[in-house]
UniProtKB/Swiss-Prot annotation:
SUPFAM superfamilies: Putative methyltransferase TM0872, insert domain, S-adenosyl-L-methionine-dependent methyltransferases. It comes from Laribacter hongkongensis (strain HLHK9). Its main location: cytoplasm. Keywords: Cytoplasm, Methyltransferase, rRNA processing, S-adenosyl-L-methionine, Transferase. PANTHER family: 12S RRNA N4-METHYLCYTIDINE METHYLTRANSFERASE (PTHR11265:SF0), S-ADENOSYL-METHYLTRANSFERASE MRAW (PTHR11265). This is Ribosomal RNA small subunit methyltransferase H. It comes from the Bacteria. It is an enzyme of class 2 (transferase). It is found in: Cytoplasm. The lineage of its organism: Bacteria, Pseudomonadati, Pseudomonadota, Betaproteobacteria, Neisseriales. GO terms for molecular function: rRNA (cytosine-N4-)-methyltransferase activity.
Length: 317
């Protein structure tokens, strides 16, 4: 990890306040990370309270284990398995679910993890280093069309075709990408127009990381599970860091907080319709200037909050 950088939890107070913690409540932190949110939640729980923390990253699990708090249950899995793991733990409903999405600062700043183009390190990018395919392995076998699609769709990179073509051309010459430095250099050659303040490798690294870790697939899988698990009055709090994540969250919350659409002219009053499963709470929240001065990486963070309706829907989306 780079020296001198201190991990600062994004929207720490805001996220935990949004959960409206009950001392005897049951809460889920879907992304423990280095435990900033979880520690604050635990500080507000009483002896009967409970927190279940998920994380794929073995390093995060090690940090969580050090807390040694009987109210904390640690799950070394991705949050897409929320239903399965809560069933295993004998938990039905919960009072709040928190998701702090994306890659964490410690992961970015640890050169050995292969998330950053700032270091020359093995091209890994797995959040869970105990399983799955590395970025280097995938780039060594994927065809040009698949690489192009991933970089275009998950990185919104205009030069996705050029980058994919160059990767495959290098392979045909026996030159396989094995380090972050090699991939960053290739991107620099292919991205002809650079965005101000952005490295030419930024979008490609984001795209491959999202794909390797199935980040958007897992997000789409967990949102409806979270709604079903919330008891009436329970809160869902989601912090997103880029437009692809936030678009999924925004559309899901919009649909889950809207009444069902009915054919025009149907003789049904609004009062007769079932209550939507969610109610939006406040407006989207961003970090303030003071916090951004301490943690510039939080500039893209946006938090959305919703509350489970009093009338439960079996058909929560």
């Amino acid at each position: 990890m780079s020296a001198g950088f201190v991990h600062v939890t994004v929207l720490l107070q805001e996220a935990v306040e949004a959960l409206a913690i009950r001392p005897d409540g049951v809460y889920v932190d879907c992304t423990f990370g280095r435990g900033g949110h979880s520690r604050l939640v635990l500080s507000r729980l009483g002896p009967a309270g409970r927190l279940v923390a998920f994380d794929k990253d073995p390093q995060a699990i090690a940090v969580a284990t050090e807390l040694d708090d009987p109210r904390l249950t640690i799950v070394h899995e991705g949050f897409a398995g929320l239903d399965r793991e809560l069933d295993r733990l004998g938990i039905d409903k919960v009072d709040g679910v928190l998701m702090d999405l994306g890659v964490s600062s410690p992961q970015i700043d640890d050169a050995s993890r292969g998330f950053s183009f700032r270091f020359d390190a093995p091209l890994d990018m797995r959040m869970d280093t105990t399983r799955g395919e590395t970025a280097a392995d995938w780039l060594a076998r994927a065809d040009e069309a698949e690489i192009r699609t991933v970089i275009r769709d998950y990185g919104e990179e205009r030069f996705a075709a050029s980058i994919a073509r160059a990767i495959v051309a290098n392979r045909l010459e026996g030159q396989f990408l094995t380090t972050t430095g090699e991939l960053a250099a290739l991107c620099a050659r292919c991205v002809r127009t650079r965005e101000k303040g952005q490295d030419p490798a930024t979008r490609t690294f984001q795209a491959i990381r999202i794909f390797i870790n199935r980040e958007l697939d897992e997000l789409q899988a967990v949102l409806p599970q979270a709604v079903r698990r919330l008891r009436p009055g329970g809160r869902l709090v989601v912090i997103a860091f880029h437009s692809l994540e936030d678009r999924i969250v925004k559309l899901f919350l919009r649909d889950a907080s809207s009444p069902p659409e009915l054919p025009r002219g149907l003789p049904v009053r609004a009062a007769d319709l079932p209550e939507p499963p969610l109610r939006l709470v406040g407006k989207p929240v961003r970090e303030g200037d003071e916090q951004l001065a301490r943690n510039p990486r939080a500039r893209s963070a946006i938090m959305r909050v919703a509350e489970r309706s009093a009338v439960a829907w079996d058909a929560a989306p």
